[in-house]
From Swiss-Prot:
Keywords associated with the record: Ribonucleoprotein, Ribosomal protein, RNA-binding, rRNA-binding
Pfam family, one: Ribosomal_L23
A single BP term in Gene Ontology: translation
Coiled-coil region(s): none
SUPFAM superfamilies assigned: Ribosomal proteins S24e, L23 and L15e
NCBIfam families xref list: PRK05738.2-4
Protein name: Large ribosomal subunit protein uL23
Species of origin: Fusobacterium nucleatum subsp. nucleatum (strain ATCC 25586 / DSM 15643 / BCRC 10681 / CIP 101130 / JCM 8532 / KCTC 2640 / LMG 13131 / VPI 4355)
Assembly and oligomerization: Part of the 50S ribosomal subunit. Contacts protein L29, and trigger factor when it is bound to the ribosome.
Matches recorded under InterPro entries: Nucleotide-bd_a/b_plait_sf, Ribosomal_uL23-like, Ribosomal_uL23/eL15/eS24_sf
Entry superkingdom: Bacteria
Signal peptide: none
UniProt similarity note: Belongs to the universal ribosomal protein uL23 family.
Chain's gene name: rplW
GO cellular component: cytosolic large ribosomal subunit
Amino acid sequence: MNVYDIIKKPVVTEKTELLRKEYNKYTFEVHPKANKIEIKKAVEAIFNVKVEDVATINKKPITKRHGMRLYKTQAKKKAIVKLAKENTITYSKEV
């Protein structure tokens, strides 16, 4: 997998902004089959920073109803990446 295929987009919410400011942790939506080692290498290659720790969260698809029709939401995987103290990532909130 290419490093740009692993990291899909940053997740920007109030909770992730709190993690970023207080603990220097950044949250990304990643490819569902990516592991922690691949995520670490991808973040280090794309943003040129040193990664200390990676935690992943798998979100299973949820069955929803729209009228009589049932459908499933898409499964997602998020990675919370902790950077070294001297490193930061700047990204646009429009991404």
